[in-house]
């Protein structure tokens, strides 16, 4: 819990320096859903909740921590929800039905070589279609080549993340140079 609180406090310190129309994505471990601080006005991110997307990876059974009810409470606080790493070993389609995320981030294992593998293309296309029907936007993680970019665009993915766009940067370096 302390690590999560520390991360949230660090993010909150830099939010005022980020343009108002930029969403801030913050990873939240499933166990953090048991931390009442996350749901309170005392949470460092509370003043910025409307700009924050909490990325949840289903690495533990969310039902064991009251996940769906807790996620509903986060929405009441103003946060948006993303299912992170969909397609990785633990992030299952059940998370889409249970959490009803505003955003779905496709794991890079589905994106790497997407342009070369017909089965991956069918899977990503089907997920993108399903997400659109459910009202979720889709982000492709790990886009590293122009060919992968062309493939995800063709398949209806909304946004990309990966080395093709930018390398990981410290705090605001990327945001402030775009």
Task: Cite the ranges covered by each PLM segment.
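Catalytic core of bacterial c-di-GMP phosphodiesterases, primarily the EAL and HD-GYP domains
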Residues: 1-69, 79, 142
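Surface-exposed amphipathic alpha-helices with a cationic face
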Residues: 15-16, 46, 68-78, 125-132, ...
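EAL-family c-di-GMP phosphodiesterase catalytic domain
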Residues: 29-32, 55-63, 79-178
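Active-site acidic short loop of glycosyltransferases
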Residues: 49, 76, 101
């Amino acid at each position: 819990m302390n690590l999560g609180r520390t991360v949230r406090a660090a993010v909150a310190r830099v939010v005022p320096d980020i343009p108002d129309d930029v969403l801030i994505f913050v990873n939240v471990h499933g166990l953090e859903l048991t931390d009442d601080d996350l749901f309170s006005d005392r949470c460092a991110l509370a003043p910025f909740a409307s700009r924050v997307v909490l990325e949840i990876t289903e690495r533990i059974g969310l039902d064991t921590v009251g996940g769906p009810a807790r996620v509903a409470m986060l929405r009441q606080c103003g946060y948006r929800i993303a299912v992170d790493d969909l397609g990785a070993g633990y992030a299952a389609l059940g998370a889409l039905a249970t959490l009803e995320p505003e955003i779905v981030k496709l794991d890079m294992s589905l994106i790497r070589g997407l342009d070369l593998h017909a089965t991956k293309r069918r899977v990503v296309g089907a997920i993108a279609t399903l997400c659109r029907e459910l009202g979720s936007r889709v982000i492709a993680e790990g886009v590293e080549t122009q060919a992968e970019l062309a493939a995800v665009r063709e398949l209806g993915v909304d946004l990309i993340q990966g080395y093709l766009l930018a390398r990981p940067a410290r705090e605001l370096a990327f945001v402030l140079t775009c």
